[in-house]
Each structure stands twice: as structure tokens, then as C-alpha cells.
Amino acid sequence: MLREGQILFTYLHLAPDFPQTDELIKSKAVCIAYETVTDNMGRLPLLAPMSEVAGRMSIQAGAQTLEKSHGGRGLLLGGVPGVEPAKVVIVGGGVVGANAARMAVGLRADVTILDRNVDTLRKLDEEFQGQAKVIYSTEDAIEKHVLEADLVIGAVLIPGAAAPKLVTKEHIAKMKPGAAIVDVAIDQGGCFETSHATTHAEPTYVVDDVVHYCVANMPGAVARTSTFALNNATLPYIVKLANKGYQQALLEDKGFLEGLNVIHGKVTCKEVAESFDLEYVDPEQAIAMFN
């Protein structure tokens, strides 16, 4: 359906999806990915709204998945007086992880956040003031805390690239029967080795007695909230494209240029090119080729 010269500006998540990448290359369209656009501080302004929604939703989904009727351990996330709360482990302390932690702490769960960025850990420690444990992420730390968890949230992101498989099938096999995982990273291939994408209609499946919730596009379940949040973030970029054309709009804004993944059959996102061993072309050079 796409043709040469058309602009596709949306979430693409190409790194784990070769068929889509191949079709976009063949289309010769201008393909700009929300999830790799950056701002002047290196943040991901068009991914952030959906990450906030998905992070908060992950705890709602996880709490429901822990119910006995959904195959879970039959735990109330926050416990009650005299009964300990569920142990929630969040792998990744970025926007998704921080929002998941806020929800879990608000429900009085026992929360642990794992991340490899010390500055991120300091910020989270300052925010939660002991209400959530913040741990430097190593293979040993992941194994220890995942095996102790009732609910694990996968919140890992490498911009533009496929998510790393940080929780292995061996870890899953050793988890508590009826424990649950929510893989928010599933749009980028997932960070659990046993993950595969599910739908809102059939959100869960079970591997080794662990309930997996791996719904792609989690924010679609709360479409009204998600739409307003996304519109607020994307509108300034859409206005730039409409008023200036894609060449000028992208070349004037280095962060916007980071969003260019494919143009005229050329791959201009390093992470996507590396995922499929494709030729990478610098985005400025690619635009200049066809000016």
C-alpha cells in the first residue's frame, strides 16, 4: 500500500521484525519511527507517553494475573494486615519501570527495581525513599530476585534495537508455581526468553507454571487515555512535517532525524541494520541522495 515518497510516521519497532522491515525497504517510503526520535536531552519524547501508560498498566495486568482464576498464585498485590504483600520485581528502571514502581508502591507491594544505570538508581532511590529497593542489575541479581518474585515486570529498552533476553527459560523454570510475568518489552521482541506476543483478547499463556502476560501494544486497552497522551506529544512534529516537508524538518532537528529508520529503500537506523545484517546509510546522506 505504501509507495515511494509517502511519509509513514508512527511506531515501527523494526529491530525484531524483519518482514516489516523488508516491506518498508521495498516500498521506498520515508519511514520515521516514534520510538527513536530524541529530544535535546537524549530522551524519547514520543515513546514516553506510551511507556508511562504501559508501565502503569503492567501492574494492573500483573495484579489481575496473580488471581487464582487467571492461573496465578492467588495473591493480593498489597496484602492485608497480618499477611505479607506480593513481591514485585521490575527489570529496568526507565520510564516504564519507574511508572510500574509508582503503581506497585501505591498498592503497597514489596517492590524491587533492577537497573544498570547508577544515576537512574540514585534518582529512583531518592524518589521512593526506601519504599522500593533499588539494585544494580547483574546476572546473579536478576536470578536471585526473579526466583523470589511473585510478579516480574520486564521493562528493558535499548532504543531502536531488539530487547535483550535478560530472564532465561532456566530462570522461568525455577520460579514459584503461579508466579506471573508481564513483558512490556514485547513490542521490541521481549526480555524474557519464554515470551511471545499475545493479544488483548487472549492475553496470557503458561510456561512451567508461570503465567505470561505479553500483550503487544498494551496501551491499546485504554485507547482514550493513550490517544490524548500521544496526540499531545506528536502534534508538534506533525506540524513541522506539514509546514516544512520531511527533508527540512528532519535536517533542522537532529533529534527528529534520529527517528528516520528507512528512506527510499535505505536503512538509516544502525540498530535495525545490525539486527538483520543490512547496509546502514547515514540519515543525512540518505536524504541528500534523493534531494
Summary of predicted features, one role per range:
Residues 3-7, 27-29, 176-179, 210:
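A short helix->loop->beta-strand "cap" motif at the edges of active sites that frequently abuts
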Residues 21, 59, 100-101, 121, ...:
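Generic hydrophobic/aromatic pocket-lining and core-packing "Φ" positions
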Residues 69-157, 204:
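Glycine-rich phosphate/diphosphate-binding loop of Rossmann-like nucleotide-binding domains
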Residues 35-76, 186, 191-291:
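Adenosine-phosphate binding glycine-rich loop
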Residues 126-209:
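Rossmann-like adenosine-cofactor binding region
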Residues 13-14, 29, 36-39, 116-118, ...:
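Short, ordered loop/turn segments at secondary-structure junctions
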Residues 1-23:
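An N-terminal-biased, well-structured beta-alpha scaffold segment characteristic
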